[in-house]
Amino acid sequence: MPLHLPHKLKTYQKNYNISYTEMFGINPKTEKNQIKTFPHHMLPSDLSGVINVCPGAGNCKRTCLHFAGNPAYMKGKNAKRLRQTIAFAADNSLYLETLFLAICRAIYKHQGETIAFRLNATSDIMWENLTFNLSPDVADFAQYKFGIKISAGKYDNILQVFLD
């Protein structure tokens, strides 16, 4: 079993300055929920200049949740969301494996609790339409690090891994 993050994922995360340990953001609204919710944010619509993660955005673009909150945190919030959006656009297969590890980590840290994930907190990505290929080294790392045994292989989408 691998003790360290697989090399290809470590390199990918380093290149885009993202980490599976920091994929989920915080949201004052979800913090009020009775169920612990992990929101996943990207830079909405076409603001990244690289990819439009909200292809159907209309009027909601101006009132997007992304612009809510304390303006003092906007610079950092924008930077993180931009990095994640660019990383997704560059290689969504490695991004999905990174997101997979982030979900595994949250499940591990909150064992025995009911938790939820909001993958489209500030995007409209159709996660259910993205094929997910879980490599053996990432599956082994998840089992070693988080005790979550999921078979490597091709899945219809990342949701299938956790819902089947």
Which residues make up each language-model segment?
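Class I S-adenosyl-L-methionine
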Residues: 1-164
